Amino acid sequence: MSSSQAEGVIRNIIREISQTCLSRGQTLSETLIAFMVKAVVLDPTNHFNVDRTLTKQDVQKLIELCVDRLMDQTSPTLQTIKMQVYFDMNYTPRREFLEMQQKLLQSRLQSLSREITDSRAKSREDLKKLYGTIVHYIIQSSNLSSSTDINTVRETTAALQSIFPPSQLGSFMSLLKSDKEQQLKENSLIVSGIRLFNKDNGEGGEAIQSLPSILNEKLPGVVSDLERELASCERLCWQYTGLLELISERDTAHSQSPVPPRLLTQALYNTRQHEAFLRLTLADVILCAQEVTRLQSDLMSRMTLLRDAIHTKTTVPTTHVFPHFSAVGRLWAGLEQEMLLLSMLTNVASGLRVFLTAESLLTPDQMELPVRTDADRCSGTAEERVLVSETSSCECCFPESTADFQHLPLQYNGFCGVALVDRNGLLLPGNTSIGVLKHKEKYYAFSSRSAAYEFSCRADEYTAAVLETASRTPELIQLLQLQQHFTSSTAYSQLPAGHQSLTAGMPSGQKLLLKSISKSDAGVQTEIHPLQSNICTSYEWNEWEMRRKAIKLANLHSKVTRSSQSDWSLMRRHNSSQTFLPKDASCQTKRDGESLVPKAQVYLSSLRGAAGFRKVDLSRAVDE
């Protein structure tokens, strides 16, 4: 059977089950149907063998069993499986959720970013359009308000012009594509910070929601609601556990219960699973509240620094305020992510309530029975510590002698496996204060010292019995975290594409399940340098380089050094010349001199028309 044919067979089985349930008034998801198909095949009481080809009768039997289980809406087992499928499909861990939000934002901005970075605008109209696209990109990236709001566009444009005027588009277009994308992200953060700072000062930003006040108002209510719901769920768990303990001890006063014990056990599983999901959700909400407190504190500090830096000076260097604006935008984006995370957790917690069937199974008399909490059970057996001498086949771990004892990866989600096997599927929380047993690199907790002794004597038998119980009760696989033990068989459609080719040439028949390839983590230590290093600098690995060197050596081997002399060789000689070195010299020249003598004053008289002019000497005598 080819891979396409095998996938078609599986789709046909799921489709037929879905149509049958739909005709009976139930609309079910394919994920739930696929999980139920696997649960039915793994149940040993149904006698399905994954090592042989399923016949038509086997396929028909499989469909009928799945339909019967899926149509039993009063079964706590079905409700628990629905709860598990719902939680797996809707809950996302914190880190994965934040990464997914970042990828969604990038995918939403990808087309705008490509349009901006690939633009070749030259005319004035094209540059104006490009600048408007950048404004739209910043609005979408910051997610502070709607891009259709005219005030938002004006505020964003004004903030962008203060840090990136349109005159800089030319230099922006000359950058590399990666540099353009980086500058777009930086400008988006700075513009977001400017708008948030203006809103904090009452200068615009009316369309921006006040996330800190919304979160401060919503978080306490969500935490209190989850704590109240968790307390109610815990009380139900304690009531079912106490009632099943009385039934397992064959108490004559309570042995005749109006509800079958198996149905009570399934209701206990339903409540315990709800409790586990609520604890996980509440832990994420508390972590979200702590992160919101930190982000708000950092945001207030940044706003104070910006206010002090801007209001006290007429001119502020951009290198001083731009990092603060970017930090404000980044902190606000963190608050938006926490808001989305809180919304997801709230929706998941509220969606779990529709799968609860535990309260309807208890009678008023059973509701009034004394409740013994998990803490009471642990305190009652705290003094009965496990003796090391009685558990020689297993290693004992105690709080005072084991590092990081509170974070040991306990098997079965911390429940006692011995009680599960010996007391008809009763779930009792393990008491780690009496000691934890380590068997084959795995840690086990027990409800009492006697249970620990029983496990140490037959550890392999009990672990196999727990897996057998989980195969008969599929909701325990996730509740006790046994998924890794049930990966030996998997649906064909879940195989990787590379592994599906291994089934080419299979014999005809509907082989629904295939054995998966076993995998395990392994490590090995090797010597880094087992031999002494000897690096040859003249080593050459290239064959053509070695050939070139060989030809060169062969040519040199046939060469002979020769000399020749021309007719003018005898005329060559060394030339020399002699010069006189410069030296300092001086000479004496004459100079002008003067003496004090009368100045000669001689003129002609009678030059104005008188007859006979004469020379008159008015010079003073030398001896005067």
From Swiss-Prot:
Please name the GO terms of the biological process aspect recorded for this protein, alphabetically.
axoneme assembly; cilium movement; regulation of cilium beat frequency; regulation of flagellated sperm motility; sperm axoneme assembly
Q: Which domain of life is it from?
A: Eukaryota
Recorded hits in InterPro entries, A to Z, give: FAP206
Q: Which UniProt keywords apply?
A: Cell projection, Cilium, Cilium biogenesis/degradation, Cytoplasm, Cytoskeleton
A single GO cellular-component term from the record reads: axoneme
Give one Pfam hit by family name: FAP206
Say yes or no: keyword Cytoplasm present: yes
Q: Where in the cell is it found?
A: Cytoplasm, Cytoskeleton, Cilium axoneme; Cytoplasm, Cytoskeleton, Cilium basal body
What family, per the record?
Belongs to the CFAP206 family.
Q: What does this protein do?
A: Essential for sperm motility and is involved in the regulation of the beating frequency of motile cilia on the epithelial cells of the respiratory tract. Required for the establishment of radial spokes in sperm flagella.
Instruction: Return the protein name.
Output: Cilia- and flagella-associated protein 206
Organism of provenance: Danio rerio
Q: Which gene encodes it?
A: cfap206
